[in-house]
Amino acid sequence: MANDQNKDYDKIIVLDYGSQYNQLITRRIREFGIYSELKPHTITAAEVKKIAPKGIIFSGGPNSVYDEGALGVDEDLFKLGIPILGVCYGMQLMAQRLGGDVEPADNREYGKADIEVTDDSAKLFRDLPKDQTVWMSHGDLVTRVPEGFRRTATSINCPISAMDDDDRKFYGIQFHAEVQNTQYGHEILHHFAFDICKAEANWSMDDFITKQIDKIRAEVGDKRVLLGLSGGVDSSVVGVLLHKAIGTQLTSIFVDHGLLRKGEADQVMESLKGKFGLNIIKVNAKDRFLGDLKGVTDPEKKRKIIGRDFIEVFNEEAAKLNGIDFLAQGTLYTDVVESGTDTAQTIKSHHNVGGLPEDLKFKLIEPLNKLFKDEVRELGEKLGMPHALVWRQPFPGPGLGIRVIGEVTEDKLEIVRDSDYILREEIAKHGLDKDIWQYFTVLPGFRSVGVMGDGRTYDYTIGIRAITSIDGMTADFARINWDVLQEISSRIVNEVKNVNRVVYDITSKPPATIEWE
């Protein structure tokens, strides 16, 4: 939502210094019912004054404040009288710019650390235990606080783990309160948002719907919008939201590119066209996509090809329809950050943001690009969408094209479809579908020796990926009961052709991403 869509909300803005965790800070603030959004670190004090936030948070980042070209801040921000919280690099930047000292640490800290609160009157730590476990990730540290500040927490390797200047409402923490590994991170951010910033929890999904519909109507006017339905939750929610806003001005194209899950094409048509009355044109483009993917093994090239083909199909269908001015997409906040902001390292290009050609003929509408996945599900339920559709498994824009590692062929796609269907059946049968955030199978592309019956086999391996998460920014592997995993494995090797081995991925995010490609 643009700023003029948020004037009635109390806001806390987060300045981006390049941390892959920075979106988590905005998510944590939103969980309190306070609107939060990431802003570039280059934002000026004058621009901040127009936004009129209740508070400002400087995010962490991978650099040193002494690096050549180190990311800075408009120092007039410190004169606005707005509470500021510096996190990790943000604390070091605050200390340096206000007259303190920052030096390289003798012992860098990455991971869990124990801190001790040194001042019982510190507002960030009000009513919290003196000893706490936090998540550190830093190579520099503050060695002397600026004038007017005091140390409020310490650790063995970081003597100044937190600091504050309560008179000016400036606060710094060397650790990451936004991640789950910090024991009282939720409470620390809550203290900053409510006790220090005095923000009110007046942002809700109902308000988002009302304002976003108004925004869509104002932007689109009497023009027409084309939506690409992928079969996933995000584009489906966009379709229902747009239909609610502009009705028959929306035309949806559902591209059956041959990269969908088992039975998915029929489910999408029945749910959205049947229940909600969306005008959906179904295009069978399977041969086109698989033909263009033939011989391609590089994951980035596959994503670009799939994204390119999507846009080409849209262009062709739009030419038949005449008068299409806008293209709608289900881009989420997490899509944007994983494709890299101006200060964050690009992890992978997303289909919704990285595959668009420069000569795009449509104006883009991305009504979900400020929302996280769980917020999109909440939005879908508020719009009256079926629970089964809203809570279906997250599905990447490139579909099964990035769950077949290496070259994509019809035979390999069938292996992934069948194994994934078995996994979803078993997870639901054991009542785990609400506890596991995302689960799917992947075909790594290598073969291994096995024995089935009296014969030797040399067949494919299937990987199972099941993770727990809140918003997809960080994730841990799901601790599925061994008996359940054994049952899933047994069914896959017995029911899916050309598979003789099943492995379970137990890697967290980071260091891995959720998808394998």
Swiss-Prot record:
Q: Specify one Pfam family.
A: GMP_synt_C
For this protein, the Enzyme Commission number is 6.3.5.2
One GO molecular function term of this record is: ATP binding
Catalytic reactions of this protein: XMP + L-glutamine + ATP + H2O = GMP + L-glutamate + AMP + diphosphate + 2 H(+)
- GO CC, one annotated term: cytosol
Which pathway features in its UniProt record?
Answer: Purine metabolism; GMP biosynthesis; GMP from XMP (L-Gln route): step 1/1
- The UniProt record lists the Glutamine amidotransferase type-1 domain at 11-202
Domain (GMPS ATP-PPase): residue spans on this chain: 203-392
Which residues constitute the catalytic centre? C88 (nucleophile), H176, E178
What keywords sit in the KW lines? Answer: ATP-binding, Glutamine amidotransferase, GMP biosynthesis, Ligase, Nucleotide-binding, Purine biosynthesis
Question: What CDD domains has UniProt attached to this entry?
Answer: GATase1_GMP_Synthase (cd01742), GMP_synthase_C (cd01997)
Q: Does Nucleotide-binding count among this protein's keywords?
A: yes
The entry's ATP-binding residues are S230, G231, G232, V233, D234, S235, S236
- Report the protein's function: Catalyzes the synthesis of GMP from XMP.
Write down the PANTHER family for this protein, in alphabetical order.
GMP SYNTHASE [GLUTAMINE-HYDROLYZING], GMP SYNTHASE-RELATED
**Subunit composition and interactions:** Homodimer.
Q: What is this protein called?
A: GMP synthase [glutamine-hydrolyzing]
Name of the gene: guaA
